[in-house]
Curated annotation (Swiss-Prot):
Gene Ontology process terms (BP): L-histidine biosynthetic process
UniProt similarity note: Belongs to the HisA/HisF family.
General function of this protein: IGPS catalyzes the conversion of PRFAR and glutamine to IGP, AICAR and glutamate. The HisF subunit catalyzes the cyclization activity that produces IGP and AICAR from PRFAR using the ammonia provided by the HisH subunit.
Gene field: hisF
Protein source organism: Chlorobium phaeobacteroides (strain BS1)
Protein name, entry field: Imidazole glycerol phosphate synthase subunit HisF
GO molecular function annotation: imidazoleglycerol-phosphate synthase activity; lyase activity
Chief localisation class: cytoplasm
Gene3D superfamilies linked: Aldolase class I (3.20.20.70)
Length: 251
């Protein structure tokens, strides 16, 4: 069995790490480089850098910051936000990204996933799926959660797999920043319906939530921000807790 991964996420806006609740009410969470260095030394398996306003503002990811982070960390770095073309993906790779995360642009141009995967390999393409419950259905949203799409979450997850995605980053907008735990219902539904890895995101508030994401949600990796940014827990503490409960992790 592959080891489960713990992945801190740097949501970046205007040169700082920020964290919000339900994609709103952002508060400062520190220096980008300080947080990146901390996680590099803290047994993080990977690091995600998301320029959270790039797609909303129709601009490129802040590549200068990406380059600085890539020079400081020696774990896989995923970069997202404003990756709307193969050229922008290439720029991210040239600035040190190991993977790119596509979200809004892929919904409006699904073949973008294929074009990037054909050039750089599926292993380098993460499709971020932001979902929110609308009635009884989980609906995909874009533009940092501002716009509702025609896709149901499972339908879109299966599509991106066929288009060449190597991984799915599944975020529950309803749970984001609430510390109420991952939405293990949709997480499990998607994780057990696709054969590519699924990263749980949105809602981690304690170590049991991480465990539940793996044990109940069947996730391959758990992404978290608040609990690590504000030093509620260290990644080592999280991994030791998971190992004690029978989850295989790298320590």
């Amino acid at each position: 069995m592959l080891a489960k991964r713990i992945i801190p996420c740097l949501d970046v806006r205007e040169g700082r790490v920020v964290k919000g609740i339900n994609f709103e009410d952002l508060r400062d969470a520190g220096s980008i480089l300080e947080q990146a260095r901390f996680y590099n030394n803290e047994l993080a398996d990977e690091l995600v850098f998301l320029d959270i306003s790039a797609s909303l503002e129709s601009r490129k990811t802040t590549l200068e910051e990406v380059l600085k982070v890539s020079e400081e960390v020696f774990i896989p770095l995923t970069v997202g936000g404003g990756i709307s073309s193969v050229e922008r993906a290439r720029d991210a790779f040239l600035h040190g990204a190991d993977k790119v995360s596509v979200n809004t642009a892929a919904v409006y141009d699904p073949k973008l996933i294929t074009r990037i995967a054909d050039q750089y390999g599926s292993q380098a393409v993460v499709v971020a799926i932001d979902v929110k419950k609308v009635g009884e259905k989980y609906i995909v949203h874009t533009h940092s959660g501002k716009e509702l799409t025609k896709y149901e979450a499972l339908e879109w997850a299966r599509m991106v797999q066929e288009l060449g995605a190597g991984e799915i980053l599944l975020t529950s907008m309803d749970r984001d920043g609430t510390k109420a735990g991952y939405d293990n219902e949709i997480l499990r539904e998607i994780s057990t319906s696709v054969h590519i890895p699924v990263i749980a995101s949105g809602g981690a508030g304690n170590l049991e939530h991480l465990y539940d994401g793996f044990a109940k949600g069947c996730a391959d990796a758990a992404l978290a921000a608040s609990i690590f940014h504000f030093r509620q827990y260290t990644i080592r503490e999280a991994k030791e807790y998971l190992r004690e409960r029978g989850i295989e992790v790298r320590l």
